Amino acid sequence: MLNYIDLLNKYDQQHLFKYIEMAPTEEKKEKFISEIEKVDFEKLRNLYKLSHQNFENVMKAVILEHIKVFDKSRFSDDERNDILSIGKKIIENNEYAVVTMAGGQGTRLGHKGPKGSFVLNVKPEPKSLFQIIAENLIRENNEYGVILNWYIMTSTENNDETVKFFADNNYFGYNKDYIKFFKQGNLPLLSEDGKLVVNHDFDIKYAASGNGTIYKAMLNDGIIDDMKKNGIKYIFIGAVDNALLNMVDPMLVGLNKKRGTEIASKTIIKNSPNEKVGVFCKKNGKPGVIEYSEMPESLIDEVDENGDLLYGESHIMCNLYTIDAIEKIANVDLPYHSAHK
């Protein structure tokens, strides 16, 4: 195993030597060196290289195609009733769970604290995003005669505040035995030139590693095992900042069950071709999502024979998975998508 001097020289992180020298105490110096030796520099280097590939060259190797979607308004009454019946049975059997991704801070909303604690000025009284979700789930529980398991993904940055926020608000009336928190992973921050970022306290600065790491976090924190123990077969994953999100949709889970698929998503059509939202498509023949910033300009306005956008189905973070799909994804290493902040 390489010591910290060899590590910093090998991975071109020599700027950290000055922080070691500037450490205010010997204890802080030793702690900082210990942090350095825990960093997976090889993984970081590979991620940095991946994020700085020539994007145009990468996209040239990707063949994009329109992906088929189901419009629920076009189902016959018999089809709709059949799908609803299947979906309702799954929910009534308590084989359905909800996961809320809430690892972010409310910074962009001008709010200090977890994003889920941000208060909206709704009628008849203001409510936090967490309260809105909790009350929506309570209504669904009452309708189906169950108590759905609710899993909430936090982050290292906001976990303690989030757990306290729920406790201070008596879990918004939700049965706390059915709420479980788990933390998403994190990664050291890199500057644009690939250097590790250090904060004012002489600690390597970390940030949440993205929503895509939710599956691995569910595995590592025992959430998948807990779901299996509770007989859960379908999991809906949504974001905390979508106050209008319908998390318990018998049509979605019923259609997924009827067609025997492992993953299903809800989508809405873009307001305009240039709306800044990722869209569903096929990438090299496989279902996927392409970010608005990555969509080739030649395809943005492309329409079909009916005049509808070929790439107009927005990805709005409304995704349903079977427990088998979650477990499969959790056991593979997904590629990272770089975020420049």
Regions found by a protein language model. Name each.
Residues 28-30, 58-63, 146, 175-178, ...:
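Generic structural motif recognizing short loop/turn segments at the entrances and edges of beta-strands
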Residues 2-180, 188, 197-215, 224-225, ...:
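N-terminal glycine-rich phosphate-binding loop and ensuing alpha1 helix
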Residues 171, 176-275:
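Conserved beta-loop-beta/alpha segment of the NTase-like Rossmann-fold superfamily
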Residues 231-236, 244-248, 253-341:
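Catalytic core of tubulin tyrosine ligase-like
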Residues 101, 112, 153, 182, ...:
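Generic beta-strand/beta-sheet core signal
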